[in-house]
Amino acid sequence: MASFFSDFGLMWYLEELNKKEFMKFKELLQQEILQLGLKHISWTEVKKASREDLANLLLKHYEEKKAWDMTFKIFQKMNRQDLMERAGREIAGHSKLYQVHLKKKLTHDYARKFNIKDQDSLKQKFTQDDCDHFENLLISKATGKKPHMVFLQGVAGIGKSLMLTKLMLAWSEGMVFQNKFSYIFYFCCQDVKKMKRASLAELISKEWPNASAPIEEILSQPEKLLFVIDNLEVMECDMSEWESELCDDCMEKQPVNILMSSLLRRKMLPESSFLVSATPETFEKIEDRIECTNVKMMAGFNESSIKVYFYSLFQDRNRTQEIFSLVRENEQLFSVCQVPVLCWMVATCLKKEIEKGRDPVSICRRITSLYTTYIFNLFIPHSAQYPSKKSQDQLQGLCSLAAEGMWTDTFVFAEEALRRNGIMDSDISTLLDVRILEKSKESEKSYIFLHPSIQEVCAAIFHLLKSHVDHPSQDVKSIEALIFTFLKKVKIQWIFFGSFIFGLLHESEQKKLEAFFGHQLSQEIKRQLYQCLETISGNKELQEQIDGMKLFYCLFEMDDEAFLPQVMNCMEQIKFVAKDYSDVIVAAHCLQHCSTLKKLSLSTQNILSEGQEHSYTEKLLICWHHVCSVLTSSKDIHVLQVKDTNFNERAFLVLYSHLKYPSCILKVLEVNNVTLLCDNRLLFELIQNQRLQLLNLSLTFLSHNDVKLLCDVLNQAECNIEKLMVADCNLSPDDCKVFVSVLISSKMLKHLNLSSNNLDKGISSLSKALCHPDCVLKNLVLAKCSLSEECWHYLSEVLRRNKTLTHLDISFNDLKDEGLKVLCGALTLPDSVLISLSVRYCLITTSGCQDLAEVLRNNQNLRNLQISNNKIEDAGVKLLCDAIKHPNCHLENIGLEACALTGACCEDLASSFTHCKTLLGINLQENALDHSGLVALFEAMKQQQCTVNLRGLRITDFDKETQEFLMAEKEKNPYLSI
């Protein structure tokens, strides 16, 4: 079907207007063009244009979507609702056509693609409860409205794709979202990744029933679009691109990672809605970079579902209860059973062991043990004790395939990959029969492991059996590289890989491997792992990069009572996020053996706030006590960071009791985004610790009464807090009055960060305190505080009178050139003591640089100026560079990121490099510098009198010639920040 717009055209609509209406349309059109700041069309041309001429003029001067948007807006102003409704009916026609197509696709093609074995599950009628569940998925609990971005989190195999399929099917049948969405488009990230480059229009066209997708029409109502993005983890995009790299053109081809970032970071189609499925690890990696309005968790099987499944598999009810209790008491194994296919694996594995007359307790020791038992049983006939040579070769080939997949992020394998790793065509049917492999629905003759975790354990077995140099793929790296990659969470799809390696080193697992493969394993692997852990223990920088939870699971799976304290007593800093009860158990298991810690950073999210049955709560609190015990067992612990955590009263009291212990000598306490479901006074009792020097409460909600309690502590003579950070704590202007007494009376407080609070009217109170002769504050951060014009006069007075304030950050406020002029009036005074000024994102233009230049020429104390993300342009930089060359200027660092600069300003910058004897660093990232400009900068830096280090250049932002030039310069000077 051709596009609705090309079928009926603008002229068709304009023909519906009478002569008087047509003239009115032209007048409103001129107003609309001016208001939108669009390319001008002369009134003479518009006035004399016929309906056909005017339609052609609009389509010639503006893109089709913009022309139609303006036309519909003018129709609305003219009260021609009938024309709007007619367009809506035509658009709805396409929507209905698409719904019919989607339903057909879901019940046929997608049933295979989503690995749904029983298509009847898609043909069943949806109940009202089903529909309510789907609708609620896209309703925010906080606002009750439709959110723009919903993340559906869940581990692999939990059923996310099936849930999305059913939701789309319900929409295609007209049962949900009928007044909300005209179109729902499904993008499978496996398919998107294969495309390498694509436009959004291309992705939509692939989903359309024929070759002529009405793209302009579909995109004309972006608020009526829902994009379902499935398996985001496959894309491996971290959303870290600069804003300038993102794209807002739906028709433009981009690398698919850029396209995905542009959609999810709301650069493209910000009015549309998104439902995104991903693993928890993926969401954790990108949550700070996207505006996610809702997060939904898919929990999988609950306890009763797991119990029902076990009872359906075992005949003896008493024996079943025994087996289920064994699983339920092992929290790690119980968590595995929440994934349906893994629940089947665990249950069938235990059943086989019982049938063979073995004790199931031993294989439930750790999950590594259960996985290896399950896999080895697949290759050993029921009546045999040992596998055949063929079975050994098949498993060895399978493990080689798994390792290649883990290192290349491959989870769907073509037959060629199987052959490359020693799996013969004749072996495939056997591997399918035992259900360790399944046919993939992605493409013909391709295969997947039953579950990604089975691929991980097979890959781990490969590394225990052979060296990476024996693998047919060079992508497979050493055991050392594996461990560091796992512990640093470089590859987010590696969930168990590293911990399985450690688990396989347990004596019982070594015996199983040796029995299956018929030869003794080398102890070299164990030595290499020990060496890795020794490297970590002796390297503070490396410890900062290690994910504590990954390390804990490795040590837990290894289950070596002698080795555990050796490792833990070498750690000086640990950071971890516990997301469930299992995580807390494993963290407690390791941390109670640690006595050398200096810094601990933790998050327990909602685990310690949820109401649970009594026995569960008691066990959880015991584990939490063991976690907190590190605060008293480690005699040198100075830093505690608690983030993104909700505490009930009992849980907080456990932490409180350890922090109040006399041997706890904290100097730094950070409590960020923490909610106390108890009396907040307990928190403020903690900060009365006289050893405390830094307190960070940012992102933690503080009531007015909380602020009073905080300031009461700060006003105490015994308080030694030098640095206070209360950014984004929901502070109000009235709270500023409470801080007045602290600023005047405290002789210790030197740094105060109040950023991201709405303080506008409170600045007058703060300023009076800052002007007081007893105020000793040195650093003040007021970034993103919604400051208005009046505030600049108050702060100007502070800069004139305060003789201790050396750093001021007022970034992300509407300072503008006028406000900057007021501040610069104070900064040009000869007795100004300010050393550092940050005015990023302050709407400063070229004009404001005149006042900054005057400051640089007169203020000999200013060393650091951060002016990034202001449109100062080349002319503004010229003014600054001329001032930097002045003998009175002692500037050392300047930040000019994203200042709309071009290569034309580089000569001025180069000149300042060679004339200013104090300038050490300049950041120019996110500016459109060209080859000749960069050559000029690097030539200047080669001069003997130049001390400047250029920062922020990213090689990939330039053309090939410039990239080669930068690489050559980097080779000459490895210290360059490129």
Curated annotation (Swiss-Prot):
This is NACHT, LRR and PYD domains-containing protein 4E. Keywords: ATP-binding, Inflammatory response, Leucine-rich repeat, Nucleotide-binding, Repeat. It comes from Mus musculus (Mouse). Belongs to the NLRP family. It holds the Pfam family LRR_6. InterPro entries: DAPIN (IPR004020), DEATH-like_dom_sf (IPR011029), Leu-rich_rpt (IPR001611), LRR_dom_sf (IPR032675), NACHT_NTPase (IPR007111), NLRP_HD2 (IPR041267), NLRP_innate_immun_reg (IPR050637), NOD1/2_WH (IPR041075). ATP binds at G154, V155, A156, G157, I158, G159, K160, S161. LRR repeats lie at residues 594-617, 694-717, 746-773, 802-825, 859-882, 916-940.
